[in-house]
Swiss-Prot record:
Keyword annotations from UniProtKB, A to Z: ATP-binding, Cytoplasm, Glycolysis, Kinase, Nucleotide-binding, Transferase
Matching PANTHER family: PHOSPHOGLYCERATE KINASE, PHOSPHOGLYCERATE KINASE 1, CHLOROPLASTIC-RELATED
Record-stated family: Belongs to the phosphoglycerate kinase family.
Protein name: Phosphoglycerate kinase
E.C. no: 2.7.2.3
GO molecular function term, any single one: ADP binding
GO terms of biological process kind: gluconeogenesis; glycolytic process
Catalytic activity of the protein: (2R)-3-phosphoglycerate + ATP = (2R)-3-phospho-glyceroyl phosphate + ADP
Domain of life per record: Bacteria
InterPro entries: Phosphoglycerate_kinase, Phosphoglycerate_kinase_CS, Phosphoglycerate_kinase_N, Phosphoglycerate_kinase_sf
Length: 391
Protein backbone atom coordinates (compact mmCIF):
# COMPACT_ATOMS: atom_id res chain seq x y z
CA UNK A 1 0.00 0.00 0.00
CA UNK A 2 1.55 3.30 -1.12
CA UNK A 3 0.16 5.35 1.78
CA UNK A 4 2.63 7.30 3.95
CA UNK A 5 2.22 6.14 7.56
CA UNK A 6 2.24 8.60 10.44
CA UNK A 7 4.26 6.08 12.46
CA UNK A 8 7.16 6.43 9.97
CA UNK A 9 7.35 10.25 10.11
CA UNK A 10 9.59 12.55 12.15
CA UNK A 11 7.05 14.87 13.79
CA UNK A 12 9.40 16.75 16.13
CA UNK A 13 8.44 20.43 16.21
CA UNK A 14 5.88 19.88 13.44
CA UNK A 15 2.31 21.16 13.44
CA UNK A 16 0.18 18.03 13.03
CA UNK A 17 -3.54 18.11 12.23
CA UNK A 18 -5.27 14.78 12.96
CA UNK A 19 -8.75 14.01 11.61
CA UNK A 20 -10.29 11.56 14.06
CA UNK A 21 -13.75 10.04 14.25
CA UNK A 22 -15.00 11.31 17.62
CA UNK A 23 -18.65 11.18 16.57
CA UNK A 24 -19.92 9.68 19.83
CA UNK A 25 -23.50 9.47 21.12
CA UNK A 26 -24.22 12.27 23.60
CA UNK A 27 -27.37 12.47 25.72
CA UNK A 28 -27.99 15.62 27.79
CA UNK A 29 -24.32 16.52 27.61
CA UNK A 30 -23.24 13.04 28.75
CA UNK A 31 -21.27 10.73 26.44
CA UNK A 32 -23.08 7.37 26.38
CA UNK A 33 -20.38 5.38 24.55
CA UNK A 34 -16.79 6.57 24.50
CA UNK A 35 -15.32 3.76 22.36
CA UNK A 36 -14.27 6.12 19.55
CA UNK A 37 -12.61 8.56 21.94
CA UNK A 38 -10.68 5.75 23.64
CA UNK A 39 -9.62 4.40 20.24
CA UNK A 40 -8.17 7.80 19.24
CA UNK A 41 -5.96 8.20 22.32
CA UNK A 42 -2.92 6.12 21.17
CA UNK A 43 -2.62 8.14 17.93
CA UNK A 44 -2.74 11.47 19.79
CA UNK A 45 -0.29 10.22 22.45
CA UNK A 46 2.13 9.04 19.77
CA UNK A 47 2.06 12.45 18.04
CA UNK A 48 2.72 14.17 21.39
CA UNK A 49 5.56 11.75 22.22
CA UNK A 50 7.10 12.51 18.82
CA UNK A 51 7.24 16.19 19.83
CA UNK A 52 4.43 17.51 17.63
CA UNK A 53 2.12 20.46 18.16
CA UNK A 54 -1.13 18.52 17.88
CA UNK A 55 -4.48 19.71 16.53
CA UNK A 56 -7.36 17.22 16.47
CA UNK A 57 -10.70 17.65 14.74
CA UNK A 58 -13.78 15.54 14.09
CA UNK A 59 -17.40 15.84 13.09
CA UNK A 60 -20.22 15.26 15.56
CA UNK A 61 -23.73 14.65 14.29
CA UNK A 62 -25.08 16.68 11.38
CA UNK A 63 -24.98 20.37 12.34
CA UNK A 64 -25.99 23.15 9.97
CA UNK A 65 -22.89 24.60 8.31
CA UNK A 66 -22.11 28.12 9.46
CA UNK A 67 -23.88 27.93 12.81
CA UNK A 68 -22.62 26.86 16.24
CA UNK A 69 -24.95 25.08 18.66
CA UNK A 70 -24.16 23.64 22.06
CA UNK A 71 -25.69 20.26 21.21
CA UNK A 72 -23.32 19.84 18.24
CA UNK A 73 -20.25 21.01 20.16
CA UNK A 74 -17.28 18.75 20.86
CA UNK A 75 -17.04 20.26 24.40
CA UNK A 76 -17.95 16.99 26.21
CA UNK A 77 -15.41 15.17 24.00
CA UNK A 78 -12.66 17.66 24.93
CA UNK A 79 -13.35 17.07 28.63
CA UNK A 80 -13.21 13.29 28.25
CA UNK A 81 -10.13 13.41 26.01
CA UNK A 82 -8.30 15.53 28.60
CA UNK A 83 -9.09 12.96 31.30
CA UNK A 84 -7.89 10.05 29.14
CA UNK A 85 -4.70 11.83 28.00
CA UNK A 86 -3.93 13.37 31.39
CA UNK A 87 -3.27 16.79 29.81
CA UNK A 88 -5.28 19.94 29.12
CA UNK A 89 -7.24 19.78 25.86
CA UNK A 90 -8.58 23.27 25.09
CA UNK A 91 -11.49 23.41 22.63
CA UNK A 92 -10.90 25.98 19.86
CA UNK A 93 -14.15 27.33 18.43
CA UNK A 94 -13.00 29.49 15.51
CA UNK A 95 -9.98 27.80 14.01
CA UNK A 96 -10.10 27.81 10.21
CA UNK A 97 -7.87 30.89 9.85
CA UNK A 98 -5.24 29.91 12.43
CA UNK A 99 -4.54 27.97 15.63
CA UNK A 100 -2.08 28.69 18.47
CA UNK A 101 -0.52 25.43 19.65
CA UNK A 102 3.03 24.63 20.77
CA UNK A 103 4.99 21.36 20.49
CA UNK A 104 3.91 18.99 23.26
CA UNK A 105 0.44 20.55 23.43
CA UNK A 106 -2.86 19.29 22.02
CA UNK A 107 -5.98 21.26 21.12
CA UNK A 108 -9.36 20.03 19.92
CA UNK A 109 -10.76 22.00 16.99
CA UNK A 110 -14.55 22.43 17.12
CA UNK A 111 -16.86 20.22 15.03
CA UNK A 112 -15.55 20.51 11.46
CA UNK A 113 -19.04 20.04 10.02
CA UNK A 114 -19.90 23.52 11.33
CA UNK A 115 -17.50 25.00 8.75
CA UNK A 116 -19.12 26.31 5.56
CA UNK A 117 -18.03 24.13 2.64
CA UNK A 118 -17.03 21.04 4.67
CA UNK A 119 -19.75 18.76 3.27
CA UNK A 120 -19.15 19.74 -0.36
CA UNK A 121 -15.36 19.24 -0.11
CA UNK A 122 -14.86 22.96 -0.85
CA UNK A 123 -11.34 23.59 -2.18
CA UNK A 124 -10.89 26.97 -0.49
CA UNK A 125 -11.76 25.45 2.90
CA UNK A 126 -9.57 22.40 2.27
CA UNK A 127 -6.62 24.69 1.46
CA UNK A 128 -7.22 26.60 4.73
CA UNK A 129 -7.16 23.32 6.67
CA UNK A 130 -3.92 22.37 4.88
CA UNK A 131 -2.34 25.74 5.75
CA UNK A 132 -2.77 25.01 9.48
CA UNK A 133 -0.30 22.12 9.48
CA UNK A 134 3.01 20.65 8.35
CA UNK A 135 1.51 17.15 8.42
CA UNK A 136 -2.11 16.09 8.01
CA UNK A 137 -3.05 12.70 9.47
CA UNK A 138 -6.24 10.94 8.36
CA UNK A 139 -7.17 8.53 11.14
CA UNK A 140 -10.97 8.38 10.74
CA UNK A 141 -11.72 5.21 8.80
CA UNK A 142 -15.43 5.61 9.62
CA UNK A 143 -15.59 8.70 7.37
CA UNK A 144 -13.11 7.54 4.70
CA UNK A 145 -16.00 6.89 2.31
CA UNK A 146 -17.05 10.56 2.39
CA UNK A 147 -15.36 13.11 0.13
CA UNK A 148 -15.42 16.13 2.45
CA UNK A 149 -12.95 18.94 3.09
CA UNK A 150 -11.55 17.34 6.28
CA UNK A 151 -11.42 13.77 4.91
CA UNK A 152 -10.44 14.31 1.27
CA UNK A 153 -9.68 17.88 0.11
CA UNK A 154 -7.12 18.60 2.83
CA UNK A 155 -5.21 15.43 1.87
CA UNK A 156 -4.61 16.92 -1.59
CA UNK A 157 -3.16 20.19 -0.29
CA UNK A 158 -1.38 19.47 3.02
CA UNK A 159 2.46 19.63 2.84
CA UNK A 160 2.52 15.97 3.94
CA UNK A 161 -0.53 13.67 4.18
CA UNK A 162 -0.36 10.41 6.11
CA UNK A 163 -2.56 7.58 7.32
CA UNK A 164 -2.90 7.34 11.10
CA UNK A 165 -2.49 4.09 13.09
CA UNK A 166 -6.26 3.45 13.39
CA UNK A 167 -6.92 3.94 9.69
CA UNK A 168 -3.92 1.82 8.68
CA UNK A 169 -4.87 -1.00 11.08
CA UNK A 170 -8.30 -1.10 9.44
CA UNK A 171 -6.90 -1.08 5.89
CA UNK A 172 -4.27 -3.71 6.77
CA UNK A 173 -6.94 -6.01 8.28
CA UNK A 174 -9.29 -5.60 5.31
CA UNK A 175 -6.46 -6.23 2.84
CA UNK A 176 -5.47 -9.36 4.75
CA UNK A 177 -9.07 -10.62 4.68
CA UNK A 178 -9.91 -9.82 1.06
CA UNK A 179 -6.75 -9.33 -1.03
CA UNK A 180 -4.60 -12.12 0.30
CA UNK A 181 -6.80 -14.31 2.53
CA UNK A 182 -5.83 -17.56 4.22
CA UNK A 183 -8.16 -20.09 2.56
CA UNK A 184 -10.91 -21.09 2.69
CA UNK A 185 -12.41 -17.60 2.83
CA UNK A 186 -15.89 -17.65 4.37
CA UNK A 187 -18.19 -14.62 4.52
CA UNK A 188 -21.37 -14.26 6.55
CA UNK A 189 -23.66 -11.62 5.07
CA UNK A 190 -26.98 -11.10 6.80
CA UNK A 191 -29.54 -8.37 7.03
CA UNK A 192 -33.16 -7.67 6.28
CA UNK A 193 -32.87 -6.99 2.54
CA UNK A 194 -30.91 -8.30 -0.44
CA UNK A 195 -31.37 -4.87 -2.04
CA UNK A 196 -29.25 -3.11 0.62
CA UNK A 197 -26.46 -5.71 0.43
CA UNK A 198 -26.65 -6.45 -3.31
CA UNK A 199 -23.30 -4.87 -4.25
CA UNK A 200 -21.69 -6.54 -1.26
CA UNK A 201 -23.01 -9.99 -2.23
CA UNK A 202 -22.09 -9.49 -5.89
CA UNK A 203 -18.51 -8.50 -5.00
CA UNK A 204 -17.91 -11.15 -2.33
CA UNK A 205 -19.27 -14.01 -4.44
CA UNK A 206 -16.23 -13.48 -6.70
CA UNK A 207 -13.79 -13.81 -3.78
CA UNK A 208 -15.16 -16.27 -1.23
CA UNK A 209 -15.12 -20.05 -0.97
CA UNK A 210 -18.30 -20.10 1.12
CA UNK A 211 -20.97 -17.42 1.51
CA UNK A 212 -23.43 -17.85 4.37
CA UNK A 213 -26.52 -15.66 3.99
CA UNK A 214 -28.81 -14.87 6.92
CA UNK A 215 -31.86 -12.90 7.97
CA UNK A 216 -34.26 -11.55 5.35
CA UNK A 217 -31.50 -11.98 2.74
CA UNK A 218 -31.51 -15.75 3.36
CA UNK A 219 -35.30 -15.85 2.93
CA UNK A 220 -34.98 -14.47 -0.60
CA UNK A 221 -32.34 -17.12 -1.42
CA UNK A 222 -34.55 -19.83 0.15
CA UNK A 223 -37.48 -18.68 -2.01
CA UNK A 224 -35.18 -18.61 -5.06
CA UNK A 225 -34.35 -22.28 -4.41
CA UNK A 226 -38.07 -23.08 -4.63
CA UNK A 227 -38.94 -23.35 -0.94
CA UNK A 228 -41.92 -21.72 0.79
CA UNK A 229 -41.03 -18.89 3.18
CA UNK A 230 -44.54 -18.22 4.51
CA UNK A 231 -45.02 -14.57 5.40
CA UNK A 232 -41.30 -14.08 6.16
CA UNK A 233 -39.56 -10.89 5.08
CA UNK A 234 -38.25 -11.49 1.55
CA UNK A 235 -37.98 -9.76 -1.83
CA UNK A 236 -39.69 -11.78 -4.59
CA UNK A 237 -38.56 -9.31 -7.28
CA UNK A 238 -34.93 -10.12 -6.42
CA UNK A 239 -35.27 -13.89 -6.84
CA UNK A 240 -33.63 -13.75 -10.32
CA UNK A 241 -30.75 -11.77 -8.76
CA UNK A 242 -30.35 -14.35 -5.99
CA UNK A 243 -30.31 -17.13 -8.60
CA UNK A 244 -27.62 -15.26 -10.56
CA UNK A 245 -25.46 -14.90 -7.42
CA UNK A 246 -25.84 -18.65 -6.76
CA UNK A 247 -24.89 -19.39 -10.39
CA UNK A 248 -21.84 -17.09 -10.14
CA UNK A 249 -20.73 -18.91 -6.99
CA UNK A 250 -21.19 -22.33 -8.61
CA UNK A 251 -19.20 -21.27 -11.67
CA UNK A 252 -16.24 -20.49 -9.39
CA UNK A 253 -16.65 -23.64 -7.33
CA UNK A 254 -17.84 -21.58 -4.35
CA UNK A 255 -20.77 -22.54 -2.16
CA UNK A 256 -23.81 -20.70 -0.75
CA UNK A 257 -25.17 -23.25 1.76
CA UNK A 258 -28.86 -22.77 2.59
CA UNK A 259 -30.57 -23.68 5.88
CA UNK A 260 -32.12 -27.14 6.21
CA UNK A 261 -34.01 -26.19 9.38
CA UNK A 262 -35.32 -22.85 10.64
CA UNK A 263 -36.91 -21.29 13.72
CA UNK A 264 -40.35 -19.85 13.00
CA UNK A 265 -43.10 -17.96 14.81
CA UNK A 266 -46.56 -16.68 13.91
CA UNK A 267 -45.82 -13.12 15.09
CA UNK A 268 -42.80 -10.81 15.19
CA UNK A 269 -42.73 -10.40 18.97
CA UNK A 270 -40.06 -10.98 21.67
CA UNK A 271 -42.29 -13.52 23.44
CA UNK A 272 -43.69 -15.20 20.30
CA UNK A 273 -43.87 -19.01 20.47
CA UNK A 274 -40.80 -20.35 18.65
CA UNK A 275 -40.87 -23.65 16.71
CA UNK A 276 -38.02 -25.43 14.95
CA UNK A 277 -39.09 -26.77 11.55
CA UNK A 278 -37.38 -28.41 8.62
CA UNK A 279 -37.20 -26.06 5.65
CA UNK A 280 -39.88 -27.95 3.70
CA UNK A 281 -42.39 -27.71 6.57
CA UNK A 282 -42.75 -23.91 6.69
CA UNK A 283 -46.44 -22.94 6.77
CA UNK A 284 -48.10 -20.10 4.88
CA UNK A 285 -48.48 -18.04 8.09
CA UNK A 286 -44.96 -18.70 9.45
CA UNK A 287 -42.25 -16.08 9.92
CA UNK A 288 -38.68 -17.41 9.65
CA UNK A 289 -36.78 -15.58 12.42
CA UNK A 290 -33.60 -17.66 12.86
CA UNK A 291 -31.66 -20.61 11.48
CA UNK A 292 -32.36 -23.97 13.13
CA UNK A 293 -29.91 -25.89 15.36
CA UNK A 294 -28.82 -28.38 12.65
CA UNK A 295 -28.07 -25.54 10.23
CA UNK A 296 -26.25 -23.57 12.94
CA UNK A 297 -24.09 -26.61 13.68
CA UNK A 298 -23.32 -27.14 9.99
CA UNK A 299 -22.35 -23.48 9.56
CA UNK A 300 -20.23 -23.64 12.75
CA UNK A 301 -18.29 -26.56 11.23
CA UNK A 302 -17.62 -24.51 8.08
CA UNK A 303 -16.35 -21.67 10.29
CA UNK A 304 -14.10 -24.09 12.21
CA UNK A 305 -12.38 -25.17 9.00
CA UNK A 306 -12.11 -21.65 7.47
CA UNK A 307 -8.82 -19.78 7.12
CA UNK A 308 -10.48 -16.35 7.02
CA UNK A 309 -13.95 -15.25 8.20
CA UNK A 310 -15.63 -11.94 7.28
CA UNK A 311 -18.78 -11.35 9.34
CA UNK A 312 -21.40 -8.73 8.53
CA UNK A 313 -24.82 -9.23 10.08
CA UNK A 314 -26.58 -11.50 12.61
CA UNK A 315 -28.33 -14.53 11.05
CA UNK A 316 -31.52 -14.19 13.11
CA UNK A 317 -33.50 -11.73 15.22
CA UNK A 318 -30.89 -12.03 17.99
CA UNK A 319 -32.49 -9.24 20.05
CA UNK A 320 -35.31 -11.73 20.83
CA UNK A 321 -33.96 -14.55 23.04
CA UNK A 322 -35.91 -17.34 21.31
CA UNK A 323 -34.44 -16.35 17.93
CA UNK A 324 -30.87 -15.60 19.04
CA UNK A 325 -29.38 -19.11 19.14
CA UNK A 326 -28.26 -19.21 15.50
CA UNK A 327 -26.32 -15.95 15.82
CA UNK A 328 -24.87 -17.05 19.17
CA UNK A 329 -23.70 -20.40 17.75
CA UNK A 330 -21.94 -18.69 14.83
CA UNK A 331 -20.47 -15.99 17.10
CA UNK A 332 -19.01 -18.62 19.43
CA UNK A 333 -17.72 -20.62 16.43
CA UNK A 334 -15.89 -17.51 15.18
CA UNK A 335 -14.53 -16.88 18.69
CA UNK A 336 -13.08 -20.40 18.97
CA UNK A 337 -11.87 -20.58 15.36
CA UNK A 338 -8.17 -20.27 14.48
CA UNK A 339 -9.16 -18.29 11.36
CA UNK A 340 -8.26 -14.63 10.79
CA UNK A 341 -11.65 -13.02 11.55
CA UNK A 342 -12.99 -9.54 10.87
CA UNK A 343 -16.41 -8.33 12.02
CA UNK A 344 -18.16 -5.07 11.16
CA UNK A 345 -21.52 -3.31 10.97
CA UNK A 346 -23.67 -1.97 13.82
CA UNK A 347 -25.80 -5.07 14.47
CA UNK A 348 -22.75 -7.31 14.21
CA UNK A 349 -20.89 -5.27 16.82
CA UNK A 350 -23.96 -5.45 19.07
CA UNK A 351 -23.84 -9.26 18.74
CA UNK A 352 -20.08 -9.27 19.47
CA UNK A 353 -20.84 -7.29 22.66
CA UNK A 354 -23.83 -9.44 23.63
CA UNK A 355 -21.79 -12.66 23.48
CA UNK A 356 -18.65 -10.99 24.85
CA UNK A 357 -16.32 -12.26 22.10
CA UNK A 358 -14.48 -9.02 21.23
CA UNK A 359 -11.17 -10.44 22.50
CA UNK A 360 -11.51 -13.52 20.28
CA UNK A 361 -12.33 -11.75 16.99
CA UNK A 362 -9.04 -10.88 15.25
CA UNK A 363 -10.19 -7.46 14.07
CA UNK A 364 -13.35 -5.50 14.82
CA UNK A 365 -14.12 -2.80 12.27
CA UNK A 366 -15.76 0.33 13.63
CA UNK A 367 -16.05 1.68 10.09
CA UNK A 368 -19.78 1.14 9.52
CA UNK A 369 -20.55 2.53 6.06
CA UNK A 370 -16.86 2.67 5.08
CA UNK A 371 -16.44 -1.01 6.03
CA UNK A 372 -19.40 -1.96 3.83
CA UNK A 373 -18.19 0.11 0.88
CA UNK A 374 -14.75 -1.51 1.12
CA UNK A 375 -16.40 -4.96 1.12
CA UNK A 376 -18.40 -3.87 -1.93
CA UNK A 377 -15.12 -3.31 -3.76
CA UNK A 378 -15.53 0.46 -3.87
CA UNK A 379 -12.65 2.93 -3.71
CA UNK A 380 -12.88 5.08 -0.59
CA UNK A 381 -12.16 8.77 -1.42
CA UNK A 382 -9.85 9.35 1.57
CA UNK A 383 -7.87 6.19 0.84
CA UNK A 384 -7.54 7.05 -2.86
CA UNK A 385 -6.31 10.56 -1.96
CA UNK A 386 -3.74 9.18 0.51
CA UNK A 387 -2.53 6.67 -2.09
CA UNK A 388 -2.15 9.45 -4.68
CA UNK A 389 -0.04 11.47 -2.20
CA UNK A 390 2.05 8.40 -1.36
CA UNK A 391 3.19 7.80 -4.95
Amino acid sequence: MSIVRMTDLDLSGKRVLIRQDLNVPIDNGQITSEQRITASVPTIKLALEKGAAVMVTSHLGRPKEGSWTEEDSLAPVATRLAALLGVDVPLVRDWVDGVDVAPGQVVLLENCRMNVGEGKDDETLARKYAALCDVFVMDAFGTAHRAQASTHGVIRFAPVAAGGPLLMAELDALAKALDNPAKPLLAIVAGSKVSTKLELLSNLVNKVDQLIVGGGIANTFIAAAGHAVGKSLNEPDLIPTANQIVADAKARGAEIPLPTDVVVAKQFLPDAQASVKSLDAVDADDLILDIGPHTAQRYAELIASAGTVVWNGPVGVFEFESFSHGTETLARAIASSKAFSIAGGGDTLAAVDKYDIAQEVTYISTGGGAFLEFLEGKTLPAVAALQARGQ
